[in-house]
Structures are given as structure tokens and as C-alpha cells.
Design a protein with these regions (language model features):
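Polytopic transmembrane helical bundles with strong interfacial aromatic enrichment
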Residues: 1-123
Length: 123
């Protein structure tokens, strides 16, 4: 299975989890910091899919863009996972997990920008 297909599957999982968290937030009450978790998952699932589309069309440098997509998956999962765990289990994933996820999201967006500027290899 290719990296692109794995990332597409992970984006689908992120989207499903984002919808489930949004439903939990809507039906279980607006408490805590959970509101940001579904948004991060849904938005960055779309970003992963868009990045893969750019890679498949050779618009961006493939390896750099795939690194950005992997960063989106890890970072959004870390960010949302920590907020969700804090809301429902009462403890954090690990200290500074949410800000670490946010920082990695910023870095991933910058890496994606770099992938558009970096010269692509000719086959």
C-alpha cells in the first residue's frame, strides 16, 4: 500500500472522529475545551486530502508535501486527542501535548508551502 493511500485512509478516520466529537460536543453539553478538537480533525483531514491531490498531480515536491501531510495527521491527532482525553478522562495525554500538536500543525503548513516552492525532480 502506498503512502498516499495510507494517508487517505487516515484522513477518513480523522474525519469520522471529528464528526463523532462534534456530535458529542453538541449532545453532551458545551463544556471544557472540546470545541476545538473536532474542528482540528475535520479541517486537517481535508488538508491531508488536498495535499495528496497536489502530490498526485505533481504540483508540489512529493516527498516534502508527504512529510507535511504526515505532520497534519500526527499533529491534529495529538491536539484533538489531548483535548478529548482531558475532557472525558480528566487527565492529559502528556504535558504540553496540545501546544506541541499546534506547533507541529504550524510547521506542517510551512513545510507544505516549502513543497510548492522547492523544485520538483524530473522523472
Amino acid at each position: 500500500m502506498t503512502t498516499s493511500r495510507i494517508l487517505i485512509a487516515l484522513a477518513g478516520l480523522m474525519g469520522a472522529c471529528g464528526v463523532m466529537l462534534a456530535a458529542a460536543y453538541a449532545h453532551l453539553g458545551h463544556t471544557g475545551d472540546l470545541e476545538a478538537a473536532p474542528s482540528m480533525l475535520l479541517f486537517h483531514a481535508s488538508a491531508v486530502l488536498g495535499t495528496i491531490a497536489l502530490v498526485e498531480r505533481s504540483v508540489v515536491h512529493a516527498r516534502i508535501a508527504l512529510a507535511a501531510a504526515i505532520g497534519f495527521v500526527i499533529a491534529a491527532s495529538l491536539f484533538a486527542g489531548d483535548l478529548t482525553l482531558r475532557q472525558y478522562a480528566g487527565h492529559r495525554l502528556f504535558p504540553f501535548a496540545t501546544p506541541s500538536g499546534g506547533t507541529l500543525l504550524i510547521a506542517s503548513w510551512l513545510v507544505l508551502a516549502l513543497s510548492a516552492l522547492w523544485p520538483r525532480r524530473r522523472a
